[in-house]
């Protein structure tokens, strides 16, 4: 039986089983998919297949963001995140960040390629004048230009590094997010060629490689966020034996470790349970009210299993 046939068989079995739910606790983090699925890059592993031409989810209007920010304050939000697509494609992003930084600590997830000297200076001014902290999280895949750009596009590493150095100069030490796409592929190849034991311990070397790269390029307090590979978007069907969470798996499990118990994301079309599942009809919990979306959600997707197994959250830490 092929891998794709096994996944289909597993999915068919899952559809007749009760799908587990987890309760909502408190609103720790509110996310905004501010540029929808529109991005200036077309990364080969993007979990929602963002690109310059993907209009599945459109930009959020500033008025929409402000309305949800006001509601989030009343609900006790502690952190705000902006993601995409590529957030710096949004012409009103700086004004939106100024408003958000009056509410809570705010982070932007970006590929870094649009952070020009002017933008970096504006971010530095926002950081200096705001009551809450501003974090910028830049995505990379490798410290080798050829390897990284094979995933993200020509010039992506050079531009991202320039962005990080500009942010550092403005007093905003960047967080670097690394998807384990290239490492996972290399580990599978190593295990295939040399046996399972050969690949053990490689993860720490992967981490050190990025840390040393950042230090050597002037990022003197490197912070890394490692992100597992998800069997969705551009990689749907490509990850071996993607699985689902079952009710029995939650017995004795602390569901508070799952981000869907304490965060929600606003995107084109409403409020969704998880940043990984924006645009998914089953993950949409409300069309226009954040309060209405603070309800139990169903763990119906393979991404839920990845979070369950790895402890992954989309937050900075």
Q: Can you say where each PLM-predicted feature lies in the sequence?
A:
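Conserved C-terminal portion of the radical SAM core fold
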Residues: 79-80, 103, 107, 130-140, ...
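Short hydrophobic segments within beta-strands
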Residues: 33, 83, 109, 177-179, ...
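Short, well-ordered amphipathic alpha-helices
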Residues: 30, 119-125, 208-211
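Eukaryotic acidic, serine/proline-rich intrinsically disordered low-complexity regions
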Residues: 1-5, 232-235
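Accessory C-terminal segments flanking Radical SAM cores
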Residues: 225-317
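Canonical radical SAM enzyme core domain
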Residues: 53-67, 87-128, 136, 140-159, ...
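Conserved alpha-helical substructure of the radical SAM core
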Residues: 6-84, 88-99, 103, 118
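Residue-level preference for long, well-ordered alpha-helices that form the structural scaffold
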Residues: 19, 61, 153-156, 199-203
């Amino acid at each position: 039986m092929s891998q794709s046939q096994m996944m289909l068989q597993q999915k068919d079995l899952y559809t007749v089983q009760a799908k587990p739910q987890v309760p909502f606790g408190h609103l720790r983090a509110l996310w905004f998919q501010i540029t929808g699925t529109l991005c200036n890059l077309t990364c080969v592993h993007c979990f929602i297949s963002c690109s310059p031409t993907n209009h599945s989810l459109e930009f959020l209007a500033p008025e929409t963001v402000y309305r949800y920010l006001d509601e989030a304050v009343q609900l006790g939000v502690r952190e705000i995140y902006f993601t995409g697509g590529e957030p710096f494609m949004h012409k009103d992003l700086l004004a939106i960040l100024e408003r958000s930084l009056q509410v809570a600590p705010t982070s932007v997830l970006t590929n870094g390629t649009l952070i020009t000297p002017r933008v970096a200076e504006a971010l530095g001014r926002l950081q200096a004048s705001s009551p809450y902290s501003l974090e910028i999280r830049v995505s990379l895949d490798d410290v080798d230009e050829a390897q990284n750009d094979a995933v993200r596009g020509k010039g992506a590493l050079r531009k991202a590094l320039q962005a990080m150095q500009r942010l550092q100069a403005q007093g905003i030490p960047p967080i670097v997010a690394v998807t384990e796409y290239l490492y996972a592929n290399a580990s599978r190849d190593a295990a295939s060629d040399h046996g399972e034991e050969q690949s053990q311990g490689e993860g720490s070397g992967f981490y050190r490689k990025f840390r040393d790269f950042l230090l050597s390029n002037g990022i003197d307090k490197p912070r890394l966020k490692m992100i597992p590979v998800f069997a969705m978007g551009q990689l749907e069907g490509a990850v071996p034996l993607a699985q689902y969470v079952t009710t029995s798996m939650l017995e004795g499990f602390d569901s508070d470790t799952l981000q869907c118990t304490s965060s929600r994301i606003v995107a084109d079309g409403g409020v969704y349970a998880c940043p990984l599942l924006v645009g998914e009809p089953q993950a949409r919990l409300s069309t226009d009210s954040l309060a209405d979306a603070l309800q139990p959600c169903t763990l119906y997707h393979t991404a839920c299993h990845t979070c369950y197994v790895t402890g992954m959250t989309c937050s900075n830490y």
